[in-house]
């Protein structure tokens, strides 16, 4: 696989001297959908803001397509066309009078023709299911709809990587599932995606791999099974097993009903495991 985004010994200190990132080594391969898992304040958002140069590191480097990111205006513009970031709060990203104008902002600043800008913008809105809202003011939309428009704004720039900070934050369960299914579908169409989250129940449903971050350090990388069978990592990161995993852990420890190495983490896996006991 091709490495599309990488950080090497990335360090970032806040102006007051606080260490936010402590030597992060991170790789994202083309076509992956991975989750950066950690509690609030672990450094997820700060790391994400380095991926396309919104923040410049104190030391270390960011590489996009094998090239070290530079921080002049031309280099940053090129980086942001390759790596698009969707902020946790869509209101931080939506500012234009209409949905269409908002989604068109990125491609307009790429020097494209008016026709190409509109085509890209409408295609992006269609992909996220928001084309009927093109002329609506963004502030009239629901939280889930705003998230979709923010995603469309990134899609319209046709990046290689989409970075989403807590994409399900503030959404009800149906809204959260809908957004995650959209991201899953985009990934299957070829978009490389990384999300930050502390929602351990959603992660096994959609992620290829997990990076666990604690106090500005990535303490473990691996598959969902590798992460959630490592009790030390779960405890250190102040996380928990998904609810499905907790049920099977209880069956194992209290009733000696075992299901092989590790516990099922999704309803589908649980169904398959239970069938073996019937």
UniProtKB/Swiss-Prot annotation:
Residues reported in the UniProt entry to bind ATP: 38-45
GO molecular function, one term: ATP binding
Reported function: ATP-binding (A) component of a common energy-coupling factor (ECF) ABC-transporter complex. Unlike classic ABC transporters this ECF transporter provides the energy necessary to transport a number of different substrates.
Keyword ATP-binding included in the entry's annotation: yes
Compartments (UniProt record): Cell membrane
Major localisation: membrane
Membrane topology category: Peripheral membrane protein
Gene3D superfamilies reported for this sequence: P-loop containing nucleotide triphosphate hydrolases (3.40.50.300)
EC number: 7.-.-.-
Gene expressing this chain: ecfA
Protein name: Energy-coupling factor transporter ATP-binding protein EcfA
Principal EC category: translocase
The protein's assembly and partners: Forms a stable energy-coupling factor (ECF) transporter complex composed of 2 membrane-embedded substrate-binding proteins (S component), 2 ATP-binding proteins (A component) and 2 transmembrane proteins (T component).
This protein's UniProt keywords: ATP-binding, Cell membrane, Membrane, Nucleotide-binding, Translocase, Transport
PANTHER family according to UniProt: ENERGY-COUPLING FACTOR TRANSPORTER ATP-BINDING PROTEIN ECFA1 (PTHR43553:SF24), HEAVY METAL TRANSPORTER (PTHR43553)
Cross-referenced InterPro entries: AAA+_ATPase (IPR003593), ABC_transporter-like_ATP-bd (IPR003439), ABC_transporter-like_CS (IPR017871), ABC_transpr_CbiO/EcfA_su (IPR015856), Co_trans_ATP-bd (IPR005876), ECF_ABC_transporter_ATP-bd (IPR050095), P-loop_NTPase (IPR027417)
GO cellular component, one term: ATP-binding cassette (ABC) transporter complex
UniProt similarity note: Belongs to the ABC transporter superfamily. Energy-coupling factor EcfA family.
GO biological process: cobalt ion transport
Annotated ranges, domain ABC transporter: 5-240
């Amino acid at each position: 696989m091709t490495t599309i985004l990488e950080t090497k010994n990335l360090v970032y200190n806040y102006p007051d001297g606080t260490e936010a990132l402590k030597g992060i080594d991170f790789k994202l391969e083309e076509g992956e959908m991975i989750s950066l898992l950690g509690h609030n304040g672990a450094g997820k958002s700060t790391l994400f803001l380095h991926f396309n140069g919104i923040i410049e590191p104190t030391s270390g480097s960011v590489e996009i397509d094998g090239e070290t990111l530079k921080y002049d205006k031309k280099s940053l513009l090129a980086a942001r066309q390759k790596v698009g970031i969707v902020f946790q709060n869509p209101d931080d990203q939506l500012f234009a009078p209409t949905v269409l104008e908002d989604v068109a902002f990125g491609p307009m600043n790429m020097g494209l023709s008016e026709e190409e800008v509109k085509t890209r913008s409408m295609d992006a809105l269609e992909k996220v299911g928001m084309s009927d809202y093109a002329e609506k003011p963004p502030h009239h939309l629901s939280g889930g709809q705003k998230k979709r428009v923010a995603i469309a704004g990134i899609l319209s720039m046709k990046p290689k990587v989409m970075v989403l900070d807590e994409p399900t934050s503030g959404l009800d369960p149906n809204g959260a599932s809908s957004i995650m299914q959209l991201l899953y579908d985009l990934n299957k169409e070829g978009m490389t995606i990384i999300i930050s989250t502390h929602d351990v129940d959603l992660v096994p449903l959609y992620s290829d791999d997990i990076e666990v971050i604690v106090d500005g350090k990535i303490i473990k990388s691996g598959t969902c099974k590798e992460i959630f069978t490592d009790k030390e990592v779960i405890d250190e990161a102040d996380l928990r097993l998904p609810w499905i995993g907790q049920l099977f852990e209880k069956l194992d420890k209290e009733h000696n009903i075992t299901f092989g190495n590790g516990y099922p983490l999704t309803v589908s896996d649980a169904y398959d495991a239970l069938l073996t006991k019937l």
